[in-house]
UniProtKB/Swiss-Prot annotation:
This is UDP-3-O-acyl-N-acetylglucosamine deacetylase. The gene is lpxC. Zn(2+) binds at H81, H237, D241. Transmembrane segments: none annotated. Its cofactor is Zn(2+). Pfam families: LpxC. The lineage of its organism: Bacteria, Pseudomonadati, Spirochaetota, Spirochaetia, Leptospirales. Signal peptide: none annotated. Keywords: Hydrolase, Lipid A biosynthesis, Lipid biosynthesis, Lipid metabolism, Metal-binding, Zinc. Catalyzes the hydrolysis of UDP-3-O-myristoyl-N-acetylglucosamine to form UDP-3-O-myristoylglucosamine and acetate, the committed step in lipid A biosynthesis. It catalyses: a UDP-3-O-[(3R)-3-hydroxyacyl]-N-acetyl-alpha-D-glucosamine + H2O = a UDP-3-O-[(3R)-3-hydroxyacyl]-alpha-D-glucosamine + acetate. One of its GO terms (molecular function) is UDP-3-O-acyl-N-acetylglucosamine deacetylase activity. GO terms for biological process: lipid A biosynthetic process.
Length: 301
């Protein structure tokens, strides 16, 4: 039996403080309750600068390394970890007030966001939000990378990563997910990166907030971190990213996701593809303001 979902917000505002991954500077984020139908909206406030950026597919302006939302003048980077926590809680209406151009990295997972939002209490509205159950296979492809979505009455993910590293060669997982399983098995998984890449980025003034406190760091043949939260934490984090990205569609998209070496670009392409195929809207409706709709080869059945 398919679940009936209701629009939700938080009961009280909650403040979240952390550092930006790239700037290394303090970021203040406040989540505010919002009326039913508001959607998820970032409110950027920095001195006299103000901007309102809705979380929607047409506002995705970059998918390199992280997912970035923008309005043509302003942008908010690295939104996916926060959005994954919002998705897991079923929240549909929030104002996210922020004083920087990137969401704080926290511990590199979605867990701090989940805990903060849960502490604010959850309010359920009478209005229903309808999940999307795909009726036909859909896929997006970029060379040897792909993301497939198959019809299924349950949310399920089969994900494989295949980096040129002894610990990440063919790391994979198949998992059936409900909201509680996502909270326990996916949201605690931290982002990961390679030491050589971190050093190169920091030499360019980027990733200044990156550390062992907020990322899994891999050396040539091992981990710098003393302990992992899961044996396959890295591939679990890719699922976290997937749901943070897919949630930008504005409706839960249910099916069996099959991913191999996918990432933010394919995640967003799939969300656009699903929304276009389900609503009957022209795919151009979801075209982002600054980047082409698909830089990827796309096939639809």
């Amino acid at each position: 039996m398919k679940e009936i979902l209701y629009r939700k917000s938080i009961q009280d505002r909650v403040r979240i403080k952390g550092i930006g991954l790239h700037s290394g500077k303090e970021v203040n984020l406040t989540a505010h309750p919002a009326p039913s139908g508001t959607g998820i909206v970032f409110e950027y406030r920095k001195g006299l600068e103000k901007a309102s950026i809705s979380v929607e597919l047409s506002n995705v302006v970059d998918t390199s390394n992280a997912t970035t939302l923008g309005d043509g003048l302003h942008k908010i980077q690295t939104v996916e970890h926060l959005l994954a926590a919002i998705y897991a809680l079923g929240l549909t209406d929030l104002i996210l007030e922020i004083d920087a151009v990137e969401v704080p990295i926290m511990d590199g997972s979605s867990l701090p966001f989940l805990q903060a939002l849960e502490s604010a209490g959850i309010v359920k509205y009478p209005e229903i939000i309808e999940p999307i159950y795909v009726q036909n296979p859909l896929w997006v492809v970029d060379g040897d990378k792909y993301l497939v979505l198959l019809p299924s009455d349950e949310l399920k993910v089969t994900y494989t990563i295949d980096f040129n590293h002894p610990l990440l060669k063919g790391q994979n997982i198949t998992i059936s997910l409900d909201k509680e399983t996502i909270k326990q098995e996916i949201l605690p998984a931290r982002t990961f990166g390679f030491l050589k890449d971190v050093e190169a980025l920091q030499a360019k003034g980027l990733a200044m907030g990156g550390s062992l406190d907020n990322a899994i760091v891999l050396t040539q043949d091992g981990y710098l971190n003393q302990q992992l939260r899961f044996e396959n934490e890295c591939v679990r984090h890719k699922i976290l990213d997937l749901f943070g990205d897919i949630s930008i569609a504005g409706r839960p998209i249910i099916g069996h996701y099959l991913a191999s070496k996918a990432g933010h670009a394919l995640d967003i392409s799939m969300a656009k593809l699903v929304m276009s195929s389900v609503t009957g809207d022209e795919i151009s409706k979801y075209k982002s303001r600054r980047i082409p709709l698909f830089k990827r080869k796309v096939a639809v059945v």
